[in-house]
């Protein structure tokens, strides 16, 4: 995982839960996807409006976020009452987890992940766009550390650990330079 540059130097790896937290795993992964019901189009009266595609996309994005909210609630139910543990779900490609290529790993490692039918573009944009994938951490100090800029040495070391080619390093990490 990438680590912030500077005094705090926080990383999501700092929030891997110790075994005594009561979870089966010290960290987790998730993926959510909402597909169109009529991807080729439909000729029913409700689908003939000009704004149908915008409405459809808006609904799918809202459903994906609602599913993520449901997952939050389900995970929090697993915590004992009064637990100081916080649960964070950083999505791959966002400021806490800025490497979009982690989506490949998450989708490959999830049991039955292929049944979600999420496809990735060369730059790891998700199709359908109403898809979310990320990591799950449970820890009392859990937060979303923002990683916006890193020194070249840190990026080069991370690229080497991930086994990136120079092209992949440019594609997935250049925004952090």
What would you call each of these model-derived segments?
Residues 33, 43-76, 144-145, 158:
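Conserved mixed alpha/beta catalytic, RNA-binding, or beta-rich assembly cores of soluble enzyme
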Residues 6, 24-26, 53, 57, ...:
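Conserved structured core elements
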Residues 25-30, 59, 133, 162:
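Structural beta-strand/beta-sheet cores of well-ordered domains, especially the beta-sheet scaffolds
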Residues 76-161, 166-174:
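Compositionally biased, low-complexity/repeat regions
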């Amino acid at each position: 995982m990438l680590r912030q540059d500077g005094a705090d130097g926080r990383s999501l790896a700092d929030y891997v839960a110790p075994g005594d937290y009561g979870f089966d795993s010290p960290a987790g992964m998730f993926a959510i996807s909402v597909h169109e019901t009529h991807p080729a189009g439909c000729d029913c009266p409700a689908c003939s409006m000009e704004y149908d595609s915008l409405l459809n996309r808006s609904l799918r994005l809202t459903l994906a976020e609602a599913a993520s909210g449901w997952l939050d609630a389900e995970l929090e139910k697993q915590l004992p009452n009064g637990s100081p543990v916080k649960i964070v779900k950083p999505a791959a490609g966002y400021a806490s987890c800025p490497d979009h290529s982690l989506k490949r790993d998450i989708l490959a490692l999830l049991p039955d992940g292929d049944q979600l039918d999420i496809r990735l573009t060369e730059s790891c944009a998700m199709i359908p766009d109403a898809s979310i994938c990320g990591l799950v951490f449970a820890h009392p100090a859990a937060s979303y550390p923002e990683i916006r800029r890193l020194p070249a040495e840190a990026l080069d070391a991370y690229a080497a650990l991930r086994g990136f080619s120079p092209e992949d390093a440019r594609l997935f990490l250049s925004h952090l330079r």
